[in-house]
UniProtKB/Swiss-Prot annotation:
Its EC number is 2.5.1.6. GO terms for molecular function: ATP binding; metal ion binding; methionine adenosyltransferase activity. Catalyzes the formation of S-adenosylmethionine from methionine and ATP. The reaction comprises two steps that are both catalyzed by the same enzyme: formation of S-adenosylmethionine (AdoMet) and triphosphate, and subsequent hydrolysis of the triphosphate. It comes from Amoeba proteus. This is S-adenosylmethionine synthase. InterPro entries: ADOMET_SYNTHASE_CS, S-AdoMet_synt_C, S-AdoMet_synt_central, S-AdoMet_synt_N, S-AdoMet_synthetase, S-AdoMet_synthetase_sfam. It is found in: Cytoplasm. CDD domains: S-AdoMet_synt (cd18079). Its cofactor is Mg(2+); K(+).
Length: 426
């Protein structure tokens, strides 16, 4: 790309109530459940779990070796409530939804190839599958993540906060009045006392930013388009919320200097252009499946993706652990100012601890050549799965709650160990 070239780039995000993202949360909550049991009995759990939801049905499929009885149907229904679905909102009903479980233990042949259930043998723990994984970092933000990704995450957090505040107040009002929560929405004198009363849990957003390419490094200039679509109550009209949502989005863009007079806001554009609202969302509107939002989960289209999803997989699966480690490597290279932007690739074959290759590309922004940076990587980082798990403490349920990665993204969040600083030997 030519020096100082300007271009437009788009990324998208979805809320916790989006059906695909809800499935990620269910799969990762089961993983957390198993790892907590593992902590107590000191035996390795192996989890590869897919969740599918549609209508009022939750399906779980996969292989789980856990030292504790598999969660009950009531446990899953509580999780559905936590995600934000409710009968009143025409979503998955946590009081009546059926839960179908088709899960068995990890296949013996895979277990034999990968490990011998010896957690101490970190040198011999093989990769859980073949594949390629990527880590990416950029100096656009203090979090060393793309600016677009960061803005979209802030949108999600702001929407979730408004949704949870409104839901709490509606429940309190319903209890005080002795009525159903749905009746609060239907009663103007009650609902009008609650800010964002009409907001439901399913939502999608998209932002287009004008970037300047500065000799391989990326400089965000301004947001050109901000798109937000939210599920809402059937009792609200577009006119009633068309000011509130743009204010919320603009507030985030203003905070990071990304709003300009040229920024176009497209808010629930379907209702504005066609007259049809978005009152039916979640799994009633669309089926959801674990692992279908892999770009949302990573860098929003920047960098690259090897194709393997994260959620529902224990750390022996390099789809997850090696992608976290590649991010750990990338963000530490940028943090150490060895480059301004970098992509790291690693690949494996099942059963073999050592990676087949490690690749680094600094897009011409490095203070060293890419081959010299590769030497620095090999000197400071060990990509064998057992060492990854140990260094990042990936089996410690007190350190990591994997369901939290499914909430609002896996990267750029300082509470996760793969985002921590490592002092490098040059």
């Amino acid at each position: 790309m030519q020096q100082n070239t300007r271009y437009l780039f788009a990324s998208e995000a979805v809320s916790r109530g989006h059906p695909d993202k809800a499935c990620d949360q269910v799969s990762d909550r089961v993983l957390d459940y198993c790892l907590q049991a593992e902590k107590k009995c000191k035996k390795a759990s192996r989890v590869a779990l897919e969740t599918t939801i549609k209508g009022n049905v939750v399906g779980l499929f996969g292989e789980v070796t856990c030292q504790k009885t598999f969660p009950t149907i009531s446990w899953f229904r509580e999780l559905v409530t936590e995600i934000g679905y409710s009968r009143e909102d025409l979503d998955l009903d946590p009081t009546t939804c059926s839960v179908h479980i088709n899960v068995r233990g990890q296949e013996a042949e895979i277990r034999g190839v990968v490990h011998n259930q010896e957690r101490a043998a970190k040198e011999t723990l093989g990769a859980g599958d073949q594949g390629l994984m990527f880590g990416y970092a950029t100096d656009e933000t203090p979090e060393r993540c793309p600016c677009l990704w960061f803005l979209l995450r802030r949108f999600k957090l702001a929407l979730r906060s408004k949704f949870e505040e409104a839901r709490k107040k509606k429940i309190e009002l319903a209890v005080a009045k002795g009525i159903k929560v749905s009746q609060v929405d239907a009663t103007p004198e009650l609902r009008d006392t609650i800010d964002f009363w009409w907001l439901h849990t399913d939502a999608k957003s998209q932002v287009i930013i004008e970037y300047e390419d500065d000799s391989g490094a990326l400089k965000p200039i301004t947001a050109r388009v901000a798109v937000l679509s939210v599920q809402h109550s059937k009792f609200v009209t577009h006119d009633q919320y068309e000011d509130r949502l743009p204010q919320l989005v603009k507030g985030v863009l203003d905070e990071y200097g990304m709003h300009s007079e040229a920024t176009e806001y497209l808010i629930n554009i379907k209702q504005k252009t066609s007259g049809y609202g978005w009152t039916v969302g979640g799994p009633n509107a669309d089926a959801g499946t674990t692992g279908r939002k892999i770009i949302v989960d990573t860098y929003g289209g920047h960098g690259a993706h090897g194709g393997g999803a994260f959620s529902g997989k224990d750390p022996s699966k390099v789809d997850r652990s090696a992608a976290y480690y590649a991010r750990y490597v990338a963000q530490n290279l940028v943090r150490a100012k060895l480059c301004r932007r970098v992509l790291v690739q690693v690949s494996y074959v099942i059963g073999k601890p050592e990676p087949l290759n490690i690749y680094v590309n600094t897009y011409g922004t490095g203070t060293h050549s890419d081959s010299e940076l590769l030497e620095i990587i090999n000197k400071n980082f060990d990509f064998r799965p057992g060492f990854i798990i140990e260094e990042l403490d990936l089996l410690n349920p007190d350190r990591i709650k994997y369901v939290e990665t499914a909430y609002h993204g896996h990267f750029g969040r300082p509470e996760f160990p793969w985002e921590q600083e490592k002092t490098l030997t040059l």
